[in-house]
Amino acid sequence: MENQKQYPMTQEGYEKLEQELEELKTVKRPEVVEKIKVARSFGDLSENSEYDAAKDEQGFIEQDIQRIEHMIRNALIIEDNGDNNVVQIGKTVTFIELPGDEEESYQIVGSAEADAFKGKISNESPMAKALIGKGLNDQVRVPLPNGGEMNVKIVEIK
């Protein structure tokens, strides 16, 4: 049996996936089944755009269900070990870009729960890779997408 990719995530991220799966199974799936039923009542399925759209939607929902079930089955819950001296998945890191004093904070999470707009970056991102394993007051070079880099100083880990 081949090794399954594990999906590191916080307990919060795991619970969010479970909620999303529950909604897909108990709300979205029955809704699309009803849409298909209604579209079938229109008759000829060969030229029935409502039926085609509902079947497409059903396919997307089933695909999402399979993807989330796979992630839940292969989830690796990251427990907080209480060590706020080292950056790791689940921790929120505050740093300043050098030179300067403006602070930025991000929580490092598994790719399944990453959301930059909510300040959650994937452990697979270049920034997180550069920060993981580093400690308080460490200066770190973070690679940028344009090929450059920025220097940051870690000022808080929680």
Curated annotation (Swiss-Prot):
UniProtKB keywords: Coiled coil, DNA-binding, Transcription, Transcription regulation
A Pfam family assignment: GreA_GreB_N
One annotated GO molecular function: RNA polymerase binding
Superkingdom, taxonomy of origin: Bacteria
Gene Ontology process terms (BP): DNA-templated transcription elongation; regulation of DNA-templated transcription elongation
Regions annotated as coiled coil: 2-70
Family affiliation: Belongs to the GreA/GreB family.
Function (record text): Necessary for efficient RNA polymerase transcription elongation past template-encoded arresting sites. The arresting sites in DNA have the property of trapping a certain fraction of elongating RNA polymerases that pass through, resulting in locked ternary complexes. Cleavage of the nascent transcript by cleavage factors such as GreA or GreB allows the resumption of elongation from the new 3'terminus. GreA releases sequences of 2 to 3 nucleotides.
Record's protein name: Transcription elongation factor GreA
Lineage: Bacteria, Bacillati, Bacillota, Bacilli, Bacillales
